[in-house]
Protein backbone atom coordinates (compact mmCIF):
# COMPACT_ATOMS: atom_id res chain seq x y z
CA UNK A 1 0.00 0.00 0.00
CA UNK A 2 1.31 3.47 -0.89
CA UNK A 3 0.53 6.89 0.51
CA UNK A 4 1.47 9.33 -2.27
CA UNK A 5 -0.33 12.29 -0.76
CA UNK A 6 1.42 11.88 2.57
CA UNK A 7 4.77 11.40 0.83
CA UNK A 8 4.34 14.63 -1.14
CA UNK A 9 3.26 16.48 2.01
CA UNK A 10 6.26 15.32 3.99
CA UNK A 11 8.59 16.12 1.13
CA UNK A 12 7.23 19.65 0.87
CA UNK A 13 7.31 20.07 4.67
CA UNK A 14 11.01 19.31 5.04
CA UNK A 15 12.04 20.73 1.68
CA UNK A 16 13.43 17.54 0.14
CA UNK A 17 14.80 17.33 -3.36
CA UNK A 18 14.85 14.05 -5.24
CA UNK A 19 18.64 13.98 -5.45
CA UNK A 20 19.24 14.78 -1.78
CA UNK A 21 20.86 12.22 0.53
CA UNK A 22 21.45 14.69 3.39
CA UNK A 23 19.22 17.71 3.88
CA UNK A 24 19.74 20.92 5.78
CA UNK A 25 17.46 23.83 6.48
CA UNK A 26 18.93 26.92 8.06
CA UNK A 27 17.10 29.30 10.32
CA UNK A 28 17.66 32.76 8.83
CA UNK A 29 18.04 34.49 12.20
CA UNK A 30 20.21 32.15 14.22
CA UNK A 31 21.96 30.10 11.55
CA UNK A 32 20.75 26.90 13.19
CA UNK A 33 21.46 23.96 10.90
CA UNK A 34 19.12 20.99 11.19
CA UNK A 35 20.46 17.90 9.44
CA UNK A 36 17.79 15.38 8.58
CA UNK A 37 19.07 11.95 7.62
CA UNK A 38 16.49 10.98 5.08
CA UNK A 39 16.13 10.80 1.31
CA UNK A 40 13.33 10.82 -1.19
CA UNK A 41 14.21 7.23 -2.02
CA UNK A 42 13.59 6.18 1.59
CA UNK A 43 10.33 8.11 1.64
CA UNK A 44 9.28 6.54 -1.61
CA UNK A 45 9.96 3.07 -0.24
CA UNK A 46 7.77 3.60 2.80
CA UNK A 47 4.83 1.24 2.56
CA UNK A 48 3.89 1.09 6.24
CA UNK A 49 2.28 3.75 8.43
CA UNK A 50 4.86 2.91 11.10
CA UNK A 51 7.69 4.11 8.87
CA UNK A 52 5.89 7.39 8.31
CA UNK A 53 5.34 7.66 12.06
CA UNK A 54 9.09 7.31 12.65
CA UNK A 55 9.80 10.11 10.18
CA UNK A 56 7.16 12.37 11.71
CA UNK A 57 8.54 11.67 15.21
CA UNK A 58 12.05 12.63 14.06
CA UNK A 59 10.80 15.84 12.45
CA UNK A 60 8.78 16.69 15.55
CA UNK A 61 11.73 16.19 17.88
CA UNK A 62 13.93 18.33 15.63
CA UNK A 63 11.28 21.04 15.54
CA UNK A 64 10.88 20.99 19.34
CA UNK A 65 14.64 21.28 19.80
CA UNK A 66 14.72 24.23 17.41
CA UNK A 67 11.88 25.97 19.25
CA UNK A 68 13.62 25.44 22.62
CA UNK A 69 16.87 26.88 21.27
CA UNK A 70 15.02 29.83 19.76
CA UNK A 71 13.35 30.49 23.11
CA UNK A 72 16.67 30.25 24.94
CA UNK A 73 18.40 32.61 22.53
CA UNK A 74 15.47 35.01 22.69
CA UNK A 75 15.72 35.09 26.51
CA UNK A 76 19.46 35.70 26.21
CA UNK A 77 18.93 38.66 23.87
CA UNK A 78 16.23 40.17 26.10
CA UNK A 79 18.51 39.87 29.14
CA UNK A 80 21.41 41.47 27.28
CA UNK A 81 19.23 44.42 26.27
CA UNK A 82 17.70 44.79 29.75
CA UNK A 83 21.04 44.66 31.59
CA UNK A 84 23.07 46.57 29.02
CA UNK A 85 23.29 49.73 31.17
CA UNK A 86 24.80 47.63 34.02
CA UNK A 87 27.64 46.45 31.75
CA UNK A 88 27.59 42.91 33.11
CA UNK A 89 30.09 40.39 31.83
CA UNK A 90 28.98 37.38 29.81
CA UNK A 91 29.65 35.06 32.76
CA UNK A 92 27.37 37.19 34.98
CA UNK A 93 24.68 37.10 32.31
CA UNK A 94 25.03 33.31 32.05
CA UNK A 95 24.52 32.97 35.81
CA UNK A 96 21.42 35.19 35.65
CA UNK A 97 20.05 33.15 32.75
CA UNK A 98 20.69 29.89 34.62
CA UNK A 99 18.90 31.24 37.70
CA UNK A 100 15.91 32.26 35.59
CA UNK A 101 15.72 28.85 33.90
CA UNK A 102 15.93 27.16 37.32
CA UNK A 103 13.00 29.27 38.56
CA UNK A 104 10.92 28.66 35.45
CA UNK A 105 11.58 24.90 35.17
CA UNK A 106 13.63 23.44 38.06
CA UNK A 107 13.30 19.81 36.90
CA UNK A 108 14.60 20.58 33.43
CA UNK A 109 17.41 22.61 34.96
CA UNK A 110 18.52 19.69 37.13
CA UNK A 111 18.41 17.30 34.19
CA UNK A 112 20.42 19.75 32.11
CA UNK A 113 22.99 20.10 34.90
CA UNK A 114 23.38 16.33 35.18
CA UNK A 115 23.75 16.01 31.41
CA UNK A 116 26.32 18.79 31.43
CA UNK A 117 28.37 17.12 34.16
CA UNK A 118 28.16 13.73 32.41
CA UNK A 119 29.17 15.34 29.13
CA UNK A 120 32.06 17.11 30.81
CA UNK A 121 33.31 13.83 32.32
CA UNK A 122 33.00 12.12 28.96
CA UNK A 123 34.87 14.92 27.20
CA UNK A 124 37.68 14.88 29.77
CA UNK A 125 37.88 11.08 29.51
CA UNK A 126 38.20 11.23 25.74
CA UNK A 127 40.71 14.08 25.76
CA UNK A 128 42.93 12.47 28.40
CA UNK A 129 42.77 8.95 26.97
CA UNK A 130 46.29 7.85 26.03
CA UNK A 131 47.03 6.88 22.48
CA UNK A 132 46.41 3.21 21.85
CA UNK A 133 49.61 1.24 22.28
CA UNK A 134 49.02 -0.91 19.20
CA UNK A 135 48.93 2.21 17.02
CA UNK A 136 51.92 3.75 18.79
CA UNK A 137 54.07 0.62 18.38
CA UNK A 138 52.62 -0.72 15.15
CA UNK A 139 51.91 -4.13 16.70
CA UNK A 140 48.77 -6.19 16.05
CA UNK A 141 46.01 -5.99 18.65
CA UNK A 142 44.41 -9.35 19.44
CA UNK A 143 40.93 -9.58 20.94
CA UNK A 144 39.96 -5.92 20.58
CA UNK A 145 40.68 -2.84 22.66
CA UNK A 146 38.19 -3.75 25.39
CA UNK A 147 38.85 -7.44 26.02
CA UNK A 148 36.71 -8.53 28.98
CA UNK A 149 36.22 -12.18 28.15
CA UNK A 150 36.26 -15.26 30.31
CA UNK A 151 37.73 -17.30 27.44
CA UNK A 152 40.87 -15.18 27.43
CA UNK A 153 43.00 -18.25 26.73
CA UNK A 154 41.41 -18.54 23.27
CA UNK A 155 42.46 -14.95 22.56
CA UNK A 156 46.09 -15.84 23.32
CA UNK A 157 45.91 -19.04 21.28
CA UNK A 158 44.52 -17.15 18.31
CA UNK A 159 47.23 -14.52 18.61
CA UNK A 160 50.01 -17.10 18.75
CA UNK A 161 48.59 -18.92 15.70
CA UNK A 162 48.54 -15.69 13.72
CA UNK A 163 51.92 -14.41 14.95
CA UNK A 164 53.95 -17.45 16.12
CA UNK A 165 57.31 -15.67 16.46
CA UNK A 166 56.25 -12.06 16.92
CA UNK A 167 54.96 -9.99 19.82
CA UNK A 168 51.38 -8.80 19.81
CA UNK A 169 49.20 -6.73 22.11
CA UNK A 170 46.26 -7.86 24.22
CA UNK A 171 44.05 -5.69 26.35
CA UNK A 172 44.30 -7.27 29.78
CA UNK A 173 41.68 -5.88 32.17
CA UNK A 174 41.76 -2.50 30.48
CA UNK A 175 45.55 -2.30 30.14
CA UNK A 176 47.56 -3.08 27.00
CA UNK A 177 50.15 -5.85 27.39
CA UNK A 178 52.86 -6.55 24.85
CA UNK A 179 53.01 -10.36 24.79
CA UNK A 180 56.32 -11.78 23.58
CA UNK A 181 56.70 -15.32 22.21
CA UNK A 182 58.42 -18.06 24.26
CA UNK A 183 61.59 -17.57 22.20
CA UNK A 184 62.17 -14.27 24.05
CA UNK A 185 62.12 -15.91 27.51
CA UNK A 186 65.89 -16.02 28.07
CA UNK A 187 66.39 -12.50 26.77
CA UNK A 188 63.74 -11.00 29.03
CA UNK A 189 64.80 -12.89 32.17
CA UNK A 190 68.27 -11.30 31.87
CA UNK A 191 66.90 -7.75 31.99
CA UNK A 192 67.88 -5.83 35.10
CA UNK A 193 65.34 -4.13 37.32
CA UNK A 194 66.69 -0.77 36.18
CA UNK A 195 65.61 -1.68 32.64
CA UNK A 196 62.31 -3.42 33.34
CA UNK A 197 60.78 -4.12 36.75
CA UNK A 198 58.55 -6.97 37.88
CA UNK A 199 57.92 -5.14 41.13
CA UNK A 200 56.56 -2.12 39.26
CA UNK A 201 54.14 -4.39 37.43
CA UNK A 202 52.71 -5.95 40.58
CA UNK A 203 52.49 -2.53 42.23
CA UNK A 204 50.43 -1.34 39.27
CA UNK A 205 48.32 -4.50 38.90
CA UNK A 206 47.33 -4.71 42.58
CA UNK A 207 47.12 -0.95 43.23
CA UNK A 208 50.13 -1.01 45.51
CA UNK A 209 49.48 2.52 46.76
CA UNK A 210 46.54 1.06 48.67
CA UNK A 211 47.67 -2.55 49.23
CA UNK A 212 51.47 -2.19 49.69
CA UNK A 213 51.95 -5.06 47.21
CA UNK A 214 54.88 -4.25 44.97
CA UNK A 215 56.53 -2.09 47.63
CA UNK A 216 58.96 -4.80 48.70
CA UNK A 217 62.22 -3.28 49.86
CA UNK A 218 65.62 -4.82 49.05
CA UNK A 219 65.80 -5.83 52.73
CA UNK A 220 62.53 -7.77 52.48
CA UNK A 221 63.55 -9.33 49.17
CA UNK A 222 66.81 -10.64 50.64
CA UNK A 223 65.13 -11.81 53.84
CA UNK A 224 62.68 -13.96 51.88
CA UNK A 225 65.16 -15.19 49.28
CA UNK A 226 68.04 -15.95 51.68
CA UNK A 227 67.06 -16.13 55.36
CA UNK A 228 63.61 -17.67 54.90
CA UNK A 229 64.87 -20.12 52.27
CA UNK A 230 67.60 -21.35 54.63
CA UNK A 231 65.08 -21.78 57.43
CA UNK A 232 63.03 -24.33 55.50
CA UNK A 233 65.00 -27.40 56.60
CA UNK A 234 65.38 -26.57 60.33
CA UNK A 235 61.64 -25.97 60.79
CA UNK A 236 60.35 -29.16 59.13
CA UNK A 237 59.57 -30.83 62.45
CA UNK A 238 57.93 -27.70 63.85
CA UNK A 239 55.95 -27.16 60.68
CA UNK A 240 54.66 -30.74 60.75
CA UNK A 241 53.18 -30.06 64.18
CA UNK A 242 51.65 -26.80 62.97
CA UNK A 243 50.14 -28.49 59.91
CA UNK A 244 48.68 -31.21 62.13
CA UNK A 245 47.08 -28.55 64.32
CA UNK A 246 45.64 -26.77 61.29
CA UNK A 247 44.17 -29.91 59.70
CA UNK A 248 42.76 -31.09 63.02
CA UNK A 249 41.00 -27.76 63.32
CA UNK A 250 39.55 -27.53 59.81
CA UNK A 251 39.22 -31.18 58.71
CA UNK A 252 39.54 -33.27 61.85
CA UNK A 253 38.88 -36.95 62.26
CA UNK A 254 36.60 -38.33 59.52
CA UNK A 255 35.64 -41.97 60.17
CA UNK A 256 32.98 -41.54 57.49
CA UNK A 257 33.31 -39.78 54.18
CA UNK A 258 32.96 -36.03 54.54
CA UNK A 259 33.26 -33.37 51.85
CA UNK A 260 35.06 -30.07 52.33
CA UNK A 261 35.40 -26.87 50.34
CA UNK A 262 39.03 -27.30 49.30
CA UNK A 263 39.87 -23.66 48.61
CA UNK A 264 38.43 -22.40 51.89
CA UNK A 265 40.10 -25.16 53.94
CA UNK A 266 43.50 -24.78 52.30
CA UNK A 267 43.53 -20.99 52.66
CA UNK A 268 43.01 -21.36 56.41
CA UNK A 269 45.37 -24.32 56.79
CA UNK A 270 48.20 -22.53 54.97
CA UNK A 271 47.56 -19.27 56.83
CA UNK A 272 47.65 -21.09 60.18
CA UNK A 273 50.68 -23.26 59.33
CA UNK A 274 52.76 -20.37 58.00
CA UNK A 275 51.47 -17.99 60.63
CA UNK A 276 52.77 -20.17 63.44
CA UNK A 277 56.27 -19.74 62.00
CA UNK A 278 55.98 -15.98 61.48
CA UNK A 279 54.03 -14.71 64.51
CA UNK A 280 53.93 -17.70 66.86
CA UNK A 281 51.39 -20.46 67.43
CA UNK A 282 49.28 -18.62 69.97
CA UNK A 283 48.85 -15.50 67.84
CA UNK A 284 48.41 -17.44 64.60
CA UNK A 285 45.76 -19.67 66.17
CA UNK A 286 43.71 -16.61 67.08
CA UNK A 287 42.30 -14.13 64.61
CA UNK A 288 45.57 -13.70 62.73
CA UNK A 289 45.21 -16.65 60.35
CA UNK A 290 41.62 -15.69 59.54
CA UNK A 291 42.72 -12.18 58.60
CA UNK A 292 45.56 -13.58 56.49
CA UNK A 293 43.07 -15.80 54.62
CA UNK A 294 40.84 -12.77 53.97
CA UNK A 295 43.67 -10.49 52.87
CA UNK A 296 44.17 -11.67 49.25
CA UNK A 297 40.43 -11.79 48.59
CA UNK A 298 39.96 -8.16 49.67
CA UNK A 299 42.65 -7.17 47.17
CA UNK A 300 41.44 -9.23 44.22
CA UNK A 301 37.77 -8.30 44.53
CA UNK A 302 38.70 -4.60 44.67
CA UNK A 303 40.92 -4.99 41.61
CA UNK A 304 38.14 -6.77 39.68
CA UNK A 305 35.56 -4.09 40.53
CA UNK A 306 37.98 -1.35 39.50
CA UNK A 307 38.56 -3.13 36.20
CA UNK A 308 34.85 -2.81 35.45
CA UNK A 309 34.84 0.87 36.47
CA UNK A 310 35.37 3.58 33.83
CA UNK A 311 38.90 4.91 34.05
CA UNK A 312 37.83 8.45 34.89
CA UNK A 313 35.93 7.35 38.01
CA UNK A 314 38.59 5.01 39.41
CA UNK A 315 40.46 7.59 41.52
CA UNK A 316 37.20 8.44 43.29
CA UNK A 317 36.10 4.84 43.85
CA UNK A 318 39.45 3.26 44.79
CA UNK A 319 39.21 4.22 48.50
CA UNK A 320 35.68 2.81 48.63
CA UNK A 321 36.56 -0.52 46.99
CA UNK A 322 39.62 -0.98 49.21
CA UNK A 323 37.80 -0.24 52.47
CA UNK A 324 37.54 -3.97 53.39
CA UNK A 325 41.28 -4.30 52.73
CA UNK A 326 42.03 -1.29 54.94
CA UNK A 327 40.07 -2.86 57.77
CA UNK A 328 41.93 -6.19 57.46
CA UNK A 329 45.29 -4.42 57.34
CA UNK A 330 44.41 -2.27 60.35
CA UNK A 331 43.48 -5.33 62.41
CA UNK A 332 46.67 -7.12 61.36
CA UNK A 333 48.81 -4.15 62.35
CA UNK A 334 47.18 -4.06 65.78
CA UNK A 335 48.01 -7.74 66.30
CA UNK A 336 51.60 -7.22 65.13
CA UNK A 337 52.25 -4.13 67.25
CA UNK A 338 53.24 -5.87 70.55
CA UNK A 339 55.22 -8.58 68.70
CA UNK A 340 57.26 -6.05 66.76
CA UNK A 341 57.81 -3.92 69.85
CA UNK A 342 59.16 -6.95 71.70
CA UNK A 343 61.52 -7.85 68.83
CA UNK A 344 62.81 -4.28 68.53
CA UNK A 345 63.45 -4.11 72.28
CA UNK A 346 65.30 -7.44 72.30
CA UNK A 347 67.40 -6.43 69.32
CA UNK A 348 68.43 -3.10 70.84
CA UNK A 349 69.22 -4.52 74.29
CA UNK A 350 71.27 -7.56 73.23
CA UNK A 351 74.88 -7.37 72.10
CA UNK A 352 75.02 -10.84 70.55
CA UNK A 353 73.09 -10.12 67.35
CA UNK A 354 74.05 -13.38 65.65
CA UNK A 355 72.42 -15.40 68.40
CA UNK A 356 69.15 -13.55 67.85
CA UNK A 357 69.19 -14.43 64.14
CA UNK A 358 69.27 -18.19 64.73
CA UNK A 359 66.25 -20.43 64.11
CA UNK A 360 65.26 -22.22 67.31
CA UNK A 361 63.22 -25.40 67.57
CA UNK A 362 59.62 -24.85 68.64
CA UNK A 363 59.82 -21.05 68.45
CA UNK A 364 58.64 -18.61 65.84
CA UNK A 365 61.15 -17.49 63.27
CA UNK A 366 63.26 -14.40 64.05
CA UNK A 367 61.67 -12.87 60.96
CA UNK A 368 61.52 -9.29 62.20
CA UNK A 369 65.12 -9.52 63.42
CA UNK A 370 66.26 -10.73 60.02
CA UNK A 371 64.61 -7.67 58.55
CA UNK A 372 66.10 -5.33 61.17
CA UNK A 373 69.59 -6.67 60.44
CA UNK A 374 69.21 -5.88 56.74
CA UNK A 375 67.75 -2.38 57.11
CA UNK A 376 69.89 0.69 57.58
CA UNK A 377 69.76 2.94 60.66
CA UNK A 378 66.29 4.32 61.24
CA UNK A 379 64.69 2.29 58.41
CA UNK A 380 63.31 -0.63 60.48
CA UNK A 381 60.38 1.31 61.93
CA UNK A 382 57.45 -0.56 63.51
CA UNK A 383 55.25 0.45 60.58
CA UNK A 384 57.77 -0.75 57.99
CA UNK A 385 58.20 -4.11 59.74
CA UNK A 386 54.42 -4.53 59.95
CA UNK A 387 54.07 -3.73 56.25
CA UNK A 388 56.76 -6.29 55.40
CA UNK A 389 54.99 -8.93 57.48
CA UNK A 390 51.62 -8.20 55.84
CA UNK A 391 53.10 -8.31 52.33
CA UNK A 392 54.80 -11.62 53.17
CA UNK A 393 51.51 -13.05 54.42
CA UNK A 394 49.72 -11.89 51.27
CA UNK A 395 52.25 -13.38 48.88
CA UNK A 396 52.84 -16.66 50.74
CA UNK A 397 49.25 -17.70 51.34
CA UNK A 398 47.06 -17.73 48.25
CA UNK A 399 49.72 -19.06 45.85
CA UNK A 400 50.57 -21.93 48.20
CA UNK A 401 46.91 -22.71 48.91
CA UNK A 402 46.05 -22.75 45.19
CA UNK A 403 48.92 -25.11 44.40
CA UNK A 404 47.75 -27.57 47.07
CA UNK A 405 44.15 -27.14 45.85
CA UNK A 406 45.00 -28.37 42.35
CA UNK A 407 47.19 -31.21 43.63
CA UNK A 408 44.45 -32.51 45.94
CA UNK A 409 42.00 -32.75 43.05
CA UNK A 410 44.56 -34.66 40.97
CA UNK A 411 45.12 -37.05 43.90
CA UNK A 412 41.38 -37.43 44.54
CA UNK A 413 40.88 -38.65 40.98
CA UNK A 414 43.83 -41.10 41.19
CA UNK A 415 43.64 -43.50 44.17
CA UNK A 416 46.64 -45.46 42.88
CA UNK A 417 48.77 -42.30 42.93
CA UNK A 418 47.85 -41.72 46.57
CA UNK A 419 49.11 -45.21 47.45
CA UNK A 420 52.32 -44.66 45.48
CA UNK A 421 53.09 -41.43 47.34
CA UNK A 422 52.24 -43.00 50.71
CA UNK A 423 54.88 -45.61 50.04
CA UNK A 424 57.46 -42.94 49.19
CA UNK A 425 56.59 -41.10 52.42
CA UNK A 426 56.98 -44.30 54.43
CA UNK A 427 60.39 -44.88 52.86
CA UNK A 428 61.62 -41.42 53.90
CA UNK A 429 60.14 -40.96 57.37
CA UNK A 430 60.78 -42.36 60.81
CA UNK A 431 57.60 -42.83 62.85
CA UNK A 432 55.93 -40.33 60.54
CA UNK A 433 58.61 -37.70 61.12
CA UNK A 434 60.13 -36.11 58.04
CA UNK A 435 63.89 -35.47 57.91
CA UNK A 436 65.14 -31.97 58.67
CA UNK A 437 66.12 -31.29 55.07
CA UNK A 438 64.68 -29.39 52.14
CA UNK A 439 62.63 -32.56 51.47
CA UNK A 440 64.30 -33.25 48.12
CA UNK A 441 64.09 -36.96 49.02
CA UNK A 442 60.39 -36.92 48.06
CA UNK A 443 61.13 -37.06 44.34
CA UNK A 444 57.80 -38.55 43.24
CA UNK A 445 55.88 -35.99 45.26
CA UNK A 446 58.00 -33.24 43.74
CA UNK A 447 57.19 -34.55 40.26
CA UNK A 448 53.47 -34.60 41.10
CA UNK A 449 53.71 -31.00 42.30
CA UNK A 450 55.68 -29.84 39.26
CA UNK A 451 53.31 -31.51 36.80
CA UNK A 452 50.29 -30.04 38.56
CA UNK A 453 51.93 -26.61 38.35
CA UNK A 454 52.47 -27.12 34.62
CA UNK A 455 48.88 -28.15 33.98
CA UNK A 456 47.41 -25.55 36.34
CA UNK A 457 49.70 -22.51 36.42
CA UNK A 458 48.71 -19.24 38.00
CA UNK A 459 48.50 -17.40 34.68
CA UNK A 460 48.96 -17.53 30.92
CA UNK A 461 51.95 -15.22 31.20
CA UNK A 462 55.17 -14.91 33.15
CA UNK A 463 58.10 -12.51 33.40
CA UNK A 464 55.72 -9.59 33.84
CA UNK A 465 57.62 -6.33 33.54
CA UNK A 466 57.14 -2.57 33.20
CA UNK A 467 59.88 -0.76 31.35
CA UNK A 468 61.66 1.92 33.37
CA UNK A 469 63.33 3.37 30.28
CA UNK A 470 63.01 2.87 26.52
CA UNK A 471 63.87 -0.72 25.68
CA UNK A 472 64.69 -2.47 22.43
CA UNK A 473 64.49 -6.27 22.40
CA UNK A 474 65.65 -8.52 19.59
CA UNK A 475 62.05 -8.90 18.44
CA UNK A 476 59.52 -6.16 17.84
CA UNK A 477 59.66 -2.36 18.12
CA UNK A 478 61.33 -0.21 20.75
CA UNK A 479 59.19 -0.08 23.90
CA UNK A 480 58.73 3.32 25.54
CA UNK A 481 59.14 3.72 29.30
CA UNK A 482 56.07 2.57 31.22
CA UNK A 483 55.13 -0.23 28.81
CA UNK A 484 53.76 -3.45 30.30
CA UNK A 485 55.12 -6.59 28.68
CA UNK A 486 55.38 -10.31 29.46
CA UNK A 487 56.10 -13.71 27.94
CA UNK A 488 53.48 -16.15 26.71
CA UNK A 489 54.18 -19.23 28.87
CA UNK A 490 50.86 -20.86 27.97
CA UNK A 491 52.60 -22.13 24.86
CA UNK A 492 55.58 -23.32 26.91
CA UNK A 493 53.51 -25.33 29.38
CA UNK A 494 51.49 -26.79 26.50
CA UNK A 495 54.29 -27.31 24.01
CA UNK A 496 54.26 -30.79 22.46
CA UNK A 497 57.94 -30.33 21.59
CA UNK A 498 58.83 -29.93 25.28
CA UNK A 499 56.16 -32.14 26.82
CA UNK A 500 54.76 -35.08 24.81
CA UNK A 501 50.98 -35.23 25.15
CA UNK A 502 50.92 -31.87 26.96
CA UNK A 503 47.19 -31.95 27.72
CA UNK A 504 47.60 -35.17 29.72
CA UNK A 505 48.51 -35.05 33.40
CA UNK A 506 51.51 -37.35 33.87
CA UNK A 507 52.59 -37.48 37.54
CA UNK A 508 55.88 -39.16 36.59
CA UNK A 509 56.79 -36.77 33.78
CA UNK A 510 59.42 -34.80 35.67
CA UNK A 511 60.59 -37.78 37.71
CA UNK A 512 61.50 -39.46 34.42
CA UNK A 513 63.24 -36.31 33.19
CA UNK A 514 65.35 -36.15 36.35
CA UNK A 515 66.50 -39.73 35.81
CA UNK A 516 68.25 -38.71 32.61
CA UNK A 517 72.04 -38.22 32.90
CA UNK A 518 72.96 -34.75 34.12
CA UNK A 519 69.37 -33.77 34.93
CA UNK A 520 69.02 -35.14 38.47
CA UNK A 521 68.95 -31.63 39.98
CA UNK A 522 66.76 -30.08 37.30
CA UNK A 523 63.00 -30.11 36.68
CA UNK A 524 62.15 -29.68 40.35
CA UNK A 525 59.15 -27.79 41.65
CA UNK A 526 61.36 -24.82 42.58
CA UNK A 527 63.30 -24.86 39.30
CA UNK A 528 63.26 -21.87 36.99
CA UNK A 529 64.09 -21.69 33.31
CA UNK A 530 62.58 -21.83 29.81
CA UNK A 531 60.98 -25.21 30.62
CA UNK A 532 59.98 -24.15 34.14
CA UNK A 533 58.54 -20.67 33.59
CA UNK A 534 55.82 -20.29 36.20
CA UNK A 535 57.96 -18.84 39.01
CA UNK A 536 59.67 -16.44 36.62
CA UNK A 537 63.41 -16.52 36.20
CA UNK A 538 66.54 -14.47 36.61
CA UNK A 539 67.22 -12.00 39.39
CA UNK A 540 63.52 -11.16 39.68
CA UNK A 541 62.23 -14.73 40.07
CA UNK A 542 59.89 -15.50 42.97
CA UNK A 543 62.11 -15.60 46.10
CA UNK A 544 59.51 -17.36 48.25
CA UNK A 545 59.23 -20.53 46.17
CA UNK A 546 61.57 -22.47 48.49
CA UNK A 547 59.45 -21.74 51.55
CA UNK A 548 56.29 -22.58 49.57
CA UNK A 549 57.83 -25.88 48.45
CA UNK A 550 58.47 -26.78 52.09
CA UNK A 551 54.94 -25.89 53.22
CA UNK A 552 53.26 -27.75 50.35
CA UNK A 553 55.18 -30.98 50.98
CA UNK A 554 54.53 -30.89 54.72
CA UNK A 555 50.79 -30.41 54.10
CA UNK A 556 50.65 -33.15 51.47
CA UNK A 557 52.48 -35.59 53.74
CA UNK A 558 49.93 -34.94 56.47
CA UNK A 559 46.97 -35.40 54.10
CA UNK A 560 48.29 -38.60 52.55
CA UNK A 561 49.21 -40.23 55.87
CA UNK A 562 45.90 -39.32 57.55
CA UNK A 563 43.22 -39.33 54.85
CA UNK A 564 41.94 -41.04 51.75
CA UNK A 565 40.70 -38.61 49.10
CA UNK A 566 38.02 -39.02 46.45
CA UNK A 567 35.84 -36.88 44.24
CA UNK A 568 32.16 -36.47 44.99
CA UNK A 569 29.89 -38.93 43.21
CA UNK A 570 29.22 -37.82 39.64
CA UNK A 571 31.78 -35.00 39.80
CA UNK A 572 34.97 -34.48 37.82
CA UNK A 573 37.94 -32.28 38.55
CA UNK A 574 36.84 -28.63 38.42
CA UNK A 575 38.16 -26.60 35.54
CA UNK A 576 39.64 -23.15 36.23
CA UNK A 577 38.42 -20.08 34.39
CA UNK A 578 40.80 -17.78 32.54
CA UNK A 579 40.11 -14.21 33.57
CA UNK A 580 40.62 -11.12 31.36
CA UNK A 581 43.95 -10.39 33.07
CA UNK A 582 45.39 -13.74 32.01
CA UNK A 583 45.17 -15.36 35.45
CA UNK A 584 43.48 -18.69 36.11
CA UNK A 585 40.77 -18.67 38.77
CA UNK A 586 39.69 -21.98 40.36
CA UNK A 587 36.20 -23.10 41.23
CA UNK A 588 35.98 -21.63 44.72
CA UNK A 589 33.06 -23.91 45.65
CA UNK A 590 34.58 -27.24 44.57
CA UNK A 591 34.70 -29.98 47.21
CA UNK A 592 36.73 -33.13 47.86
CA UNK A 593 35.75 -36.02 50.12
CA UNK A 594 38.09 -36.78 53.04
CA UNK A 595 38.02 -40.04 55.00
CA UNK A 596 40.44 -40.91 57.78
CA UNK A 597 42.66 -43.92 57.13
CA UNK A 598 42.20 -45.31 60.65
From Swiss-Prot:
Mode of membrane association: Single-pass membrane protein
Give the transmembrane ranges: 107-127
| Metal-binding among keywords | yes
A biological process (GO) of this protein is: secondary metabolic process
Q: Where in the cell is it found?
A: Membrane
What cofactors does the UniProt entry give for this protein?
heme
Q: Has UniProt tagged this entry with the keyword Iron?
A: yes
Residues given in the record as heme binding sites: 542
One Gene Ontology term, aspect cellular component: membrane
The top EC class, named as a word, is oxidoreductase
Q: Which Pfam family would be a valid example here? A: p450
Task: State the pathway, as annotated in the record.
Answer: Mycotoxin biosynthesis
Q: Which UniProt keywords apply?
A: Glycoprotein, Heme, Iron, Membrane, Metal-binding, Monooxygenase, Oxidoreductase, Transmembrane, Transmembrane helix, Virulence
> A Gene Ontology molecular-function term?
monooxygenase activity
Q: What Enzyme Commission number(s) appear in the record?
A: 1.-.-.-
Q: Which residues are glycosylated?
A: 171, 428, 494, 549, 581
**Job of this protein:** Cytochrome P450 monooxygenase; part of the gene cluster that mediates the biosynthesis of the mycotoxins phomacins, leucine-derived cytochalasans with potent actin polymerization-inhibitory activities and monocot-specific antigerminative activities. The first step in the pathway is catalyzed by the hybrid PKS-NRPS phmA, assisted by the enoyl reductase phmE, that are responsible for fusion of the leucine precursor and the polyketide backbone to produce a 2-pyrrolidone intermediate.
What does the similarity note say?
Belongs to the cytochrome P450 family.
Which protein are we looking at?
A: Cytochrome P450 monooxygenase phmB
Q: Which organism is it from?
A: Phaeosphaeria nodorum (strain SN15 / ATCC MYA-4574 / FGSC 10173)
Amino acid sequence: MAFPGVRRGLGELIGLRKSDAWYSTEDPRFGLTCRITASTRKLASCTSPWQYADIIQFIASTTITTIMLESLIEQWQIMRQAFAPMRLSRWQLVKLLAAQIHRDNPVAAKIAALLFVAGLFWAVSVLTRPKRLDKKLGLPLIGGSRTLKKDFATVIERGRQMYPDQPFIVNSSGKPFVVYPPSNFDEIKRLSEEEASAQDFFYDATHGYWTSVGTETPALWKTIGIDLARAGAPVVSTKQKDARTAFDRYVGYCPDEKSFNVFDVMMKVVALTNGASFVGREVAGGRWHELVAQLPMTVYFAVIFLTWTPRLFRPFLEPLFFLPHFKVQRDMRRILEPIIKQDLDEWSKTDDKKEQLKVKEGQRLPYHKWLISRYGPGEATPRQLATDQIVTAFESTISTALTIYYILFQLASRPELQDELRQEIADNTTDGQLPSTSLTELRKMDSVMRESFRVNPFALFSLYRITRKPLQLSTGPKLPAGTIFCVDVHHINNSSALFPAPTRYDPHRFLNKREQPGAEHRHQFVSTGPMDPNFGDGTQACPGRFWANNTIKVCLVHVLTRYRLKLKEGHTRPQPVCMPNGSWVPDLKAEVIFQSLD
